[in-house]
């Protein structure tokens, strides 16, 4: 069984810990992508145009015998209206608000995707491909004292000592304006993801670290494929606590 070094809050190595079998799972990018896309689809809200969009006009057709097509035309004008091919007309087949856009994933596939994404967090090649900046040796396992940090300043000091804070700065200064219409729809900026901190149980660090740029803090019970592989790309830079490693034994089977 593989082992990993454990570090304290100053970044010094203080011992070793055995890694559970979940870190030996095969890398399955196909299952990871399937699970992440399903999670994103299941968050979608119903959307569609107004029932009367493009229909608010009194345009009527001229009838036969005038040498023009039988489309509705504005009053005192020859300009077409209402029909899909006219400017300002209705959509022919608009999105339906009643459509079911949710996706289902087999339970075994979803769990396999999580196991595979967990194993990818200790692969330096995959972590580097995601663009993370780090100096620490993977996997990064911290003592349980990390879970008791109550101040964001203390978390920053730990990340600096562990050689991970550069990745938080990458996310902080990597924010940029989104291309396309989304910037008008409440999602003006695109944000990068940085460090994922996994704790064994609900503890103060869940609030202490949550306001850092790109940082997510969760317990083992809340882990999912999207947290471990944002944007379907596995290999997220992850910090585990000793208790979190212990809870992974036999999880997601």
UniProtKB/Swiss-Prot annotation:
PANTHER family for the chain: 60S RIBOSOMAL PROTEIN L4
Composition bias, Basic residues: 82-94
Family per record: Belongs to the universal ribosomal protein uL4 family.
Region (Disordered): 62-107
UniProt feature coiled coil, ranges: none
Ranges of biased composition (kind: Basic and acidic residues): 95-107
Cystine connections: none
Record bears the keyword Calcium: no
Database matches in SUPFAM superfamilies: Ribosomal protein L4
Taxonomic lineage of the native organism: Archaea, Methanobacteriati, Methanobacteriota, Stenosarchaea group, Methanomicrobia
Role summary: One of the primary rRNA binding proteins, this protein initially binds near the 5'-end of the 23S rRNA. It is important during the early stages of 50S assembly. It makes multiple contacts with different domains of the 23S rRNA in the assembled 50S subunit and ribosome.
Name of the gene: rpl4
GO biological process: translation
GO molecular function terms attached to this record: rRNA binding; structural constituent of ribosome
HAMAP family linked to this entry: Ribosomal_uL4_A
Self-association and partners: Part of the 50S ribosomal subunit.
Record key words, sorted: Ribonucleoprotein, Ribosomal protein, RNA-binding, rRNA-binding
InterPro entries documented for this protein: Ribosomal_uL4, Ribosomal_uL4_dom_sf, Ribosomal_uL4_euk/arc_CS, Ribosomal_uL4_euk/arch, Ribosomall_uL4-arc
Organism: Methanosarcina mazei (strain ATCC BAA-159 / DSM 3647 / Goe1 / Go1 / JCM 11833 / OCM 88) (Methanosarcina frisia)
Protein name: Large ribosomal subunit protein uL4
GO cellular component: ribonucleoprotein complex; ribosome
Keyword Repeat annotated: no
């Amino acid at each position: 069984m593989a082992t990993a070094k454990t570090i304290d809050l100053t970044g010094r190595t203080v011992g070793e810990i055995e890694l559970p079998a979940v870190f030996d799972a095969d890398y399955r990018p196909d299952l990871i992508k399937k699970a992440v896309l399903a999670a994103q689809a299941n968050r979608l809200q119903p959307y569609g145009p107004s029932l009367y969009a493009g229909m608010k006009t009194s345009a009527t057709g001229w009838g036969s015998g005038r040498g023009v097509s039988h489309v509705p035309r504005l009053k005192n004008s020859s300009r077409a209206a209402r029909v899909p091919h006219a400017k300002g007309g209705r959509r022919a087949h608009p999105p339906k608000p009643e459509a079911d856009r949710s996706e289902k994933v087999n339970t075994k596939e979803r769990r396999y995707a999580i196991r595979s994404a967990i194993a990818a967090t200790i692969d330096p090649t995959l972590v580097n491909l995601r663009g993370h900046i780090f100096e620490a040796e993977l996997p990064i396992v911290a003592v349980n004292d990390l879970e008791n940090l109550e101040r964001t300043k203390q978390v920053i000091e730990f990340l600096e000592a562990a050689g991970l804070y550069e990745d938080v700065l990458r996310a902080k200064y990597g924010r940029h304006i989104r291309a396309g219409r989304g910037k008008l729809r409440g999602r003006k900026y695109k944000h990068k993801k940085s460090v994922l901190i996994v704790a064994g149980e609900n503890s103060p660090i869940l609030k202490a670290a949550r306001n850092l740029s790109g940082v997510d803090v969760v317990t083992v019970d809340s882990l999912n494929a999207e947290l471990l592989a944002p944007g379907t790309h596995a290999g997220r830079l992850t910090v585990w606590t000793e208790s979190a490693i212990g809870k992974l034994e036999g999880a997601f089977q």
